[in-house]
Amino acid sequence: MTTQLPHEKGFHISWDQIHRDSRALAWRLDNHGPDDGAWKAVVAITRGGMAPAMIVARELDIRTVDTISVVSYHSGGGKADERREAKVLKGPDADLMGDGEGVLIIDDLVDSGKTLELVRTLYPKAHFATVYAKPEGEPMVDTFITGVSQDTWIFFPWDMALQYVDPYRGKD
């Protein structure tokens, strides 16, 4: 196991911080939906978008929540994660989604924008929101809270213990 960061810079996010930033995202989205300011549903991009989506749904009192599972990274076996072509593993309910109008699609981070680019082609009228955004991916997101440099690696609390630990079942 390497002791080096996967990228030049690391930004550690605590549970408290992701909660505060996700609430800030909800406040920014409040009263901006197409139905008199309301949104009809929240769709989380799994897995990273699940915690922010839960918080946004709670804050905006949105009861219809679904997920879309997109894979665009491959764990590099102790090396930095490697990008690969994005593909949908599980889509949200088709009747709910239509072209995406009135739906908030939430993720934790837009990095290269490849995941959001794929999902946007499927649901062009959805509103895409992330908590954090890197410059390369910013054009793919409609609303975000905090910008971070492209060379910053974000360590989310669901990936961390006192030090990084691999998931019990391994990778991918």
Swiss-Prot record:
The protein's annotated catalytic reaction(s) are:
GMP + diphosphate = guanine + 5-phospho-alpha-D-ribose 1-diphosphate; XMP + diphosphate = xanthine + 5-phospho-alpha-D-ribose 1-diphosphate; IMP + diphosphate = hypoxanthine + 5-phospho-alpha-D-ribose 1-diphosphate
Task: Please tell me where 5-phospho-alpha-D-ribose 1-diphosphate binds in this chain.
Answer: R47, G48, R84, D107, D108, L109, V110, D111, S112, G113, K114, T115
InterPro entries this protein is in?
Answer: PRibTrfase_dom (IPR000836), PRTase-like (IPR029057), Xanthine_Guanine_PRibTrfase (IPR023747)
Q: In which pathway does it act?
A: Purine metabolism; GMP biosynthesis via salvage pathway; GMP from guanine: step 1/1; Purine metabolism; XMP biosynthesis via salvage pathway; XMP from xanthine: step 1/1
Where do the annotations place xanthine binding? Answer: D111, I154
State the disulfide connectivity.
none
Q: Where does GMP bind?
A: R84, D111, S112, G113, K114, T115, W153, I154
Q: Record-annotated residues binding guanine?
A: D111, I154
* Cited Pfam families: Pribosyltran
- What cofactor is needed? Mg(2+)
Broad class of the protein's primary localization = membrane
| Keywords for the protein's UniProt record, in alphabetical order | Cell inner membrane, Cell membrane, Glycosyltransferase, Magnesium, Membrane, Metal-binding, Purine salvage, Transferase
Q: Which SUPFAM superfamilies match?
A: PRTase-like (SSF53271)
An example of a Gene Ontology cellular component annotation for this protein is:
plasma membrane
Places the protein is found: Cell inner membrane
- Please state the Enzyme Commission number of this protein: 2.4.2.-, 2.4.2.22
Which CDD domains does the record cross-reference, listed alphabetically?
Answer: PRTases_typeI
Question: Which residues participate in Mg(2+) binding?
Answer: D108
Q: Which GO terms describe its molecular function?
A: guanine phosphoribosyltransferase activity; hypoxanthine phosphoribosyltransferase activity; magnesium ion binding; xanthine phosphoribosyltransferase activity
- Membrane topology summary: Peripheral membrane protein
Q: Which NCBIfam families match?
A: PRK09177.1
Q: How does it assemble?
A: Homotetramer.
Q: What does this protein do?
A: Purine salvage pathway enzyme that catalyzes the transfer of the ribosyl-5-phosphate group from 5-phospho-alpha-D-ribose 1-diphosphate (PRPP) to the N9 position of the 6-oxopurines guanine and xanthine to form the corresponding ribonucleotides GMP (guanosine 5'-monophosphate) and XMP (xanthosine 5'-monophosphate), with the release of PPi. To a lesser extent, also acts on hypoxanthine.
Similarity field? Belongs to the purine/pyrimidine phosphoribosyltransferase family. XGPT subfamily.
Q: By what name is this protein known?
A: Xanthine-guanine phosphoribosyltransferase
Which organism encodes this protein? Jannaschia sp. (strain CCS1)
